[in-house]
Amino acid sequence: MKAYKLLRIKNGKLYPLFIHRKFETPMNIWMRAECYPTKGFAVRKGWHCCFIPYAPHLNMVLSNGEQRVWAECEIKEWDTYNRPESQGGAWILAQKIKIIRTLQMEEVEKMLLKYA
């Protein structure tokens, strides 16, 4: 199934936002979720993704210069996890993920117009 994941981009490489954040996330390779308990975060094993590239509670560019990018992914073995609309609604917790490509912001904006 197709899903969308928000990642950090640094020196042209992709990394998770918060959990296991130093892990370089390769493209076009199936990866299995592992559990990395992290202080300040609930333990939810799985790659956190969205049905659409929408996470209104997260900024795309941080004051420290960190930049984020949406990626189109393929996922397997997934469940949904309900969150408030202020956090984008239902999240996906996938046990397997393959990052297909990154999206340009214009592409994201066009996709979101379909769901507005």
Residue map of PLM features:
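Charge-dense polyanion-binding interfaces
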Residues: L62-I100
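ADP-ribose/NAD+-binding catalytic cleft of ART/PARP-like enzymes
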Residues: M1-R44, M60-R68, I75, D79
